[in-house]
Amino acid sequence: MKRLFTGATAIILLASVLSACGGNSNSSGNAGASSSPSTGGSSSAESSAGNEPKEKVTINLWAFTDEIPNMTTKYLATHPDANVEFKTTIIATTDGAYQPALDQALAAGGKDAPDIYAAEAAFVLKYSQGDASDYAANYADLGLTDDMVKEADIAQYSVDIGSKDGQLKALGYQATGGAFIYRRSLAKDTFGTDDPATIKNEIGPGWDKFFDAAAKLKAKGYGIVSGDGDIWHPIENSSDVGWLVDGKLHIDPKREQFLDLSKKLKDNGFHNDTQDWTEAWYADMSGSGKQPIFGFFGPAWLINYVMNGQVKDTNGDWAVTEPPTGFFWGGTWLLANKDVAKDEAKKAAVADFIHWVTLDTSETGLQNYWANGTMKDGEQGTKDSVASAVVMSKSNGQIDLLGGQNMFDVFVPANANASGKNLTQYDESINIIWRDQVREYTSGNKSRDQAIADFKQRVKDELNIDSE
């Protein structure tokens, strides 16, 4: 999935037929993608039944990274009788390129229209519940039932985000419930232990305890987080309601509190005042910032795909525990075009692939490979948190970066504690405006009231959304 890597390096326009190349692991981001259009051979499987093979079903798959397209290779390897080929289009979200292209393709319809398409957390509600939701098939119409969801014990927040009026339209394969990821050595020096069960009670529940811990860490010369962006995601996704109520801009009290908590971090020197996705933020993962930083908030993907390449000498000096408040961050959902139901063969093929990715809890299901890092035969890939608690409960989440801790012991409850009922289809744009104004306030460039007023005005000017 694309995990909110907004600094993607290139626009990927790969209106291509995926070649059978297989990913090295559960890869993230835009690895292996070209910055210019390229075309290859079909990713397909021949039917072994009958003397005259039936014409293959072509599935048009749209995505914004090569992650889901790479899954088709594993699917075909584990389904040798699948009479299907995948025609893949990958367009990066850089500069907002993916959504307009997807919207146009869905509206145009026809044989080249997307049959399966991906949407990430930043804009999935547009396709599952919002303006573009009418294009999406109900999972039930594909034979993917609520009982299957229950049997797989899919994280409820993922179901809520993918549902409209009680009808499931999208599911993810990954679960992105968040934890607090902290330095063991700093925990021992400050709190006398690095035990996750003890640390969770030092930093929470609630922000009051978190800031009590920040004061203790500061006395030892440590910051509790790298920047205010580190607390934004748990604040944003633990709010009671989203940015819109009855079509008008609403500032949930928990989100408004971000102004005060951000200022408290800055005024007390509790962080290094970095911005996420910058070199200074990465430096704090390796312990090379201006003061050692205790921790970061994030899902398993932050550990696997971001910190793993940045921790350097601090590798193994990390652990995960429950955060002060439940939240999720990121994720990718799969949707099917409702028009696939018009062709029984295509409907069956699309349903089988989506089931394998999102609901199959067997040893040959995508989520089992994903959780255990076994996507590529004979190689240990990256272990990751998945949507099915059934799969997580029987998988081994021990990783070296966490000193051998089984991260699934923390991420299973983290996924259960996340809420998917506070999102809107405008979150990506509104969040940028909000965080800009919070930084203006904490930097002393404007008053709290002015920051809120300017936030409301920019939302009106840029999105034509009035305030309550």
Locations of the language-model features?
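Extracytoplasmic ligand-binding clamshell segments of periplasmic binding protein
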Residues: 97-99, 227, 237-323
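C-terminal capping/gating helix-and-loop segments adjacent to ligand/active sites or protein-protein/ligand interfaces
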Residues: 396-463
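Short, well-ordered beta-strand elements
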Residues: 53-66, 84-90, 116
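Helix-loop-helix "hinge/cap" segment bordering the ligand-binding cleft or interdomain interface
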Residues: 147-149, 159-231, 243-276, 338-343, ...
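Hinge/lid segment of periplasmic solute-binding proteins
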Residues: 119-179, 208, 317-319, 401
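Short, low-complexity disordered leader/linker segments with a strong preference
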Residues: 1-58, 450, 457-468
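Extracytoplasmic/periplasmic substrate-recognition and gating elements
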Residues: 107, 310-381, 436
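Extracytoplasmic "Venus flytrap"/periplasmic binding protein-like
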Residues: 80-154, 189-190, 287-295
